[in-house]
């Protein structure tokens, strides 16, 4: 059950970016599982990709091709085309070549994306057979349908949209994402597509996406497993009648950056809220670090601890598990006598020991909530980081035990 995640908000169309959805029946007959996205000619495209060494065939191709002109993005669900070797690369290339043939573009202008079961051959003929229907369905108004089309174990589609005015012109930023398990992006299985009608140089666009992803997609984790297929793309169609943004400065860039960051954050947190079997949305906030990296080390150690995650599921304020996780995070010369830990606003540990004012009833009251913040004060410096995660439930085990059956 998704935690605090409702129906999709209004997803504003982006001029110069169209989406079409069709059914290839890859995993289930009749399911719309192929999504084609068309970028206006002259669009700039940026991407961040999984750091998993076993990255999927479509990731390899997309990383190579994103440097050149991009006209189409082709996504299939139900099959990850990962762990498939050279035949997988050939299969991904074939689907791109077929789409290029149907649209009259160069095959290198088509970027492939896949999500689903790892290690199974990509059903190329099924995907090829669905491409014309997806092209016939292309529309700037198909964001919501595409958000559903890219889902796998997700229970709800995920999307966000922002608009702002600059010199009397409306700029739109809209994005969708998918993911519910195998989530610890490190640019899980996570796909994200964000488009804007602003005109942005590729260098500025790439850095904007890197910054946005590092503050959102790269700060979420459900199970600590980094997928073979993670991708997040940012497309700027340049259809808005405004000057090109060529430097990361000025009011237009600042407004665009804020909109992109807000969309990234909303769709990234939606992945956590819809985490497989999740009953809690958990914020792990680490303050007072000597470096940002040690804050991340502590945050991820807490967020990945099975003992903490199961305590969250049980609504059990077992604060000793949090202290143990902080202590094994590998922070050099950690002075535990300076550490304070909070559940919500309740101080559960002060100076490395149980807080004198703490009662079990206070902790239990916080743990009963659907949205919980664990705040850790290291007392070592001025650096801070925040991670978003979930609990670990019976349902998570069931979903993943039965995934291929």
Swiss-Prot record:
GO cellular component: cytoplasm
Documented EC number(s): 2.3.1.35, 2.3.1.1
Pathway: Amino-acid biosynthesis; L-arginine biosynthesis; L-ornithine and N-acetyl-L-glutamate from L-glutamate and N(2)-acetyl-L-ornithine (cyclic): step 1/1; Amino-acid biosynthesis; L-arginine biosynthesis; N(2)-acetyl-L-ornithine from L-glutamate: step 1/4
Residues flagged as site, Involved in the stabilization of negative charge on the oxyanion by the formation of the oxyanion hole: 115-116
CDD domains documented for this protein: OAT
Keyword Acyltransferase: yes
Statement: the UniProt record of this protein carries the keyword Nucleotide-binding: no
Catalytic activity: N(2)-acetyl-L-ornithine + L-glutamate = N-acetyl-L-glutamate + L-ornithine; L-glutamate + acetyl-CoA = N-acetyl-L-glutamate + CoA + H(+)
Active site annotation, chain numbering: 189
HAMAP family registered for this protein in UniProt: ArgJ
Subunit structure: Heterotetramer of two alpha and two beta chains.
Function: Catalyzes two activities which are involved in the cyclic version of arginine biosynthesis: the synthesis of N-acetylglutamate from glutamate and acetyl-CoA as the acetyl donor, and of ornithine by transacetylation between N(2)-acetylornithine and glutamate.
Protein name: Arginine biosynthesis bifunctional protein ArgJ
Species whose genome carries this gene: Pseudomonas fluorescens (strain ATCC BAA-477 / NRRL B-23932 / Pf-5)
């Amino acid at each position: 059950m998704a935690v605090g995640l409702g129906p999709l908000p209004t997803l504003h169309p982006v001029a110069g970016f169209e989406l079409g959805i069709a059914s290839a029946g890859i995993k289930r007959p009749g399911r719309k599982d192929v999504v084609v996205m068309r970028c206006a000619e002259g669009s700039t495209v940026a991407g961040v990709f999984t750091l998993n060494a076993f990255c999927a065939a479509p990731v390899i191709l997309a990383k190579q091709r994103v440097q050149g002109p991009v006209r189409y993005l082709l996504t299939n669900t139900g099959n990850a085309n990962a762990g498939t070797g050279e035949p997988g690369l050939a299969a991904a290339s074939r689907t791109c070549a077929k789409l290029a043939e149907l649209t009259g573009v160069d095959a290198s202008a088509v970027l492939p994306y896949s999500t689903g079961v790892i290690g199974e051959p990509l059903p190329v003929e099924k995907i090829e057979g669905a491409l014309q229907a997806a092209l016939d369905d292309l529309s700037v108004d198909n964001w919501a349908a595409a958000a559903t089309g890219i889902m796998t174990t997700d229970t709800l589609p995920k999307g966000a949209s922002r608009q702002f005015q600059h010199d009397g012109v409306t700029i739109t930023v809209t994005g969708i994402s998918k993911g519910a398990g195998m989530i610890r992006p490190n640019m899980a299985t996570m796909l994200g597509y964000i488009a804007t009608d602003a005109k942005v140089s590729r260098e500025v666009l790439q850095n904007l996406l890197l910054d946005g992803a590092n503050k959102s997609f790269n700060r979420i984790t459900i199970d600590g497993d980094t997928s073979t297929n993670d991708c997040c793309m940012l497309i700027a169609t340049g259809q808005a009648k405004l000057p090109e943004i060529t430097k990361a400065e000025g009011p237009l860039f600042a407004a665009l950056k804020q909109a992109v960051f807000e969309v990234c954050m909303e769709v990234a947190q939606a992945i956590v809220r819809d985490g497989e079997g999740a009953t809690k949305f958990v914020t792990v906030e680490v303050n007072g670090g000597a470096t940002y990296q040690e804050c991340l080390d502590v945050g991820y150690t807490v967020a990945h601890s099975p003992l903490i995650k199961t305590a969250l599921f049980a609504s059990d304020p077992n604060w000793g598990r949090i202290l143990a996780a902080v202590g094994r995070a590998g922070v050099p010369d950690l002075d535990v006598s300076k550490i304070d830990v909070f559940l919500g606003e309740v101080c559960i540990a002060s100076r490395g020991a149980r807080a004198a004012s703490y009662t079990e009833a206070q902790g239990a009251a916080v743990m009963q909530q659907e949205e919980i913040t664990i705040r850790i004060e290291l007392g070592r410096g001025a650096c801070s980081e925040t991670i978003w995660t979930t609990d670990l439930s019976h349902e998570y085990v069931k979903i993943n035990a039965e995934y291929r059956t």
